[in-house]
Amino acid sequence: MKFVDEAVIRADAGDGGNGTVSFRTEKYVPRGGPDGGDGGDGGDVYLLADENVNTLIDFRFERFHAAERGENGRGGNCTGHRGEDKILTVPVGTRAIDEETGEVIADLTDHGVKVMVSKGGFHGLGNTRFKSSVNRAPRQKSMGSKGEIRHLRLELLLLADVGMLGLPNAGKSTFIRSVSAAKPKVADYPFTTLIPSLGVVRVDAERSFVIADIPGLIEGAADGAGLGIRFLKHLERCRVLLHMIDLLPADGSDPVENAFTIINELDKYSDKLANKPRWLIFNKVDLLSEEDTQAKISEVLEALAWEGDYYCISALTRDGTKELTYNLMTTIESLPQNKYDEIEEKVEKVEFKWDDYHAEQIKKAEEDDDDDDWDNWNEDDYDVEIIYKP
């Protein structure tokens, strides 16, 4: 199935059902009083994280999603049926952003998490609610409120412990093939990797971590060159970044300049990502003598003023990969237990509440009482007053 990590949808919650005006009429009960029921609440729209789903492709073809409208109230004090909720299944790691405000509505990082993204309208009141000592035969009702409508941008961010970045053909995919069971495509031309991929690295029978590979970056990626930087978002949840540096680039470029290219693109994308723990991985040491290898590594470290961790490996021959994976596992285990950077769930507060909304309608009806009660039964005023939500 095609990998799609972004989609824009419209989530329409259901409108609330209207209240109704009705009076109890039975044999021998000529003046039974009001019995108009309330409407039903509108259905809500939810996002549900499912580990069995791994792409947002379905939302590319179906962008409009609506919950059911609440049923209108009925006579006999019958309340309308609540509208059915709309539940949208998304991959674990999906983030929902309001297109209009840029607000993060939900961030679903665990299987089974269910978050409301669009709130259904509240039910209207039947005329029974407006009965009072001075208005025994109310002909007022209130309409159900409109359901919330949101335009959402869904973004899928891979959940991995370690993320890899580097120029095309630096050896990232070869490294993942050598340390995990994943088999990303490997070839001798740029941008062999077109979509992100994951691999599980098993250090021993009981310990493992997940590593993510994204398409290579080139100079100007922040401005759209190559595949751009749209895939860098998949590294936001990673706890450690591996910066792969090719010691002997096929195009004859300078490893120092290549290293600065990646660092500059990271800085342009996000300070948060640029400040994550990052290790330098010098690849293809099997193609150089030990003396040349040390000379090139020293040159890069000096130019970057690097004081962090670095490793020399050959992804093809697996030289140095075992030590690297063990040290990665140890580092991951030493980091705080919260696996991912928690993004505070920000659900927009609905501007009105049931109790306040209904109380306002009843108060307004009392103030505008038209003296239409059973004492004036012979009066010919049977018009129904409809109260609209302000």
UniProtKB/Swiss-Prot annotation:
Keyword Kinase found: no
Pfam families given in the database record: GTP1_OBG, MMR_HSR1
GO MF terms held by the record: GTP binding; GTPase activity; magnesium ion binding
Chain residues that bind Mg(2+): S173, T193
Biased composition annotated in UniProt, kind: Gly residues: 33-42
GO biological process: ribosome biogenesis
Domain called OBG-type G: residue spans: 160-333
InterPro entries assigned to the protein according to its UniProt record, in alphabetical order: G_OBG, GTP-bd, GTP-bd_Obg/CgtA, GTP1-OBG_CS, GTP1_OBG_dom, GTP1_OBG_dom_sf, OBG_GTPase, P-loop_NTPase
EC number: 3.6.5.-
A GO CC annotation given for this chain: cytoplasm
Binding of GTP, residues: 166-173, 191-195, 213-216, 283-286, 314-316
Main location: cytoplasm
Domain Obg intervals: 1-159
Superkingdom field: Bacteria
Assembly and oligomerization: Monomer.
PANTHER family: DEVELOPMENTALLY REGULATED GTP-BINDING PROTEIN-RELATED, MITOCHONDRIAL RIBOSOME-ASSOCIATED GTPASE 2
Protein family: Belongs to the TRAFAC class OBG-HflX-like GTPase superfamily. OBG GTPase family.
Function: An essential GTPase which binds GTP, GDP and possibly (p)ppGpp with moderate affinity, with high nucleotide exchange rates and a fairly low GTP hydrolysis rate. Plays a role in control of the cell cycle, stress response, ribosome biogenesis and in those bacteria that undergo differentiation, in morphogenesis control.
Record protein name field: GTPase Obg
Organism: Photobacterium profundum (strain SS9)
Gene: obg
